[in-house]
Amino acid sequence: MDAQPKILIACNRHVRETYLAEADLEQLATFAEWDWFECEGGGIYDTNDDPETTKALGERLGNYDGLVVCHGCPTLHAGILDQAPRLKFIGELEGDRFASRIDVDAAWQHGICTVDTTNGSSYPVSEWALALIMISLRNAGAHFRRIIGGDLTPSSQDDFGYINGDLTGKR
């Protein structure tokens, strides 16, 4: 491996312009040489199935030590990985836990580590969900007793607090 690893980022233009902040790319440049392979097609859960894009990516991978993939990237199967003898790791920015963009078995057979960052927001999201559950429990006992008592009338849509979501002063 050269003094600095070479990293290829394979994604569509939208990801390049909105997900990858210039400050992050500048930080990456402090310890690695990086380049961008633009590939349009596919989406969050499906990959780019254009054979020309797949061929071009395979031809380009031979000079890289790492690959970061996201929306637009073709599926990284054994045929592509055969063309990447230097490749040591593949990172997935977002998606479905490698289900579509990375053939994990093929990567492991080639000695390539795979890293998935799609769960990077799991803790903040779970904290937010817990907070919403706690908020929804406000007056839960009273509402439950009302329902058990046969009062199935929803809140009046004329109620200012109902329409505007105002919880001030409620207990």
What are these regions (language model features)?
Residues R86-R101:
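ADP-ribose/adenylate-binding Rossmann-like module
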Residues M1-D65, C70:
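N-terminal glycine-/charge-rich "phosphate-binding" loop or analogous flexible N-terminal tail
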Residues A84-F89, Q109-I112:
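A short helix->loop->beta-strand "cap" motif at the edges of active sites that frequently abuts
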Residues H110-R171:
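Phosphate-binding beta-alpha-beta segment of Rossmann-like dinucleotide-binding domains, i.e.
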Residues L28, I80-R86:
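Short, conserved loop/helix-junction motifs that constitute active-site signature segments
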Residues Q4, L87, T168-R171:
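Phosphate-coordination loops involved in phosphoryl transfer and adenosine-cofactor binding
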Residues A99-I112:
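Rossmann-fold NAD(P)-binding glycine/threonine-rich loop
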Residues D46-E52, C70-G72, G149-D159:
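Short gly/ser/thr-rich secondary-structure transition/capping motifs
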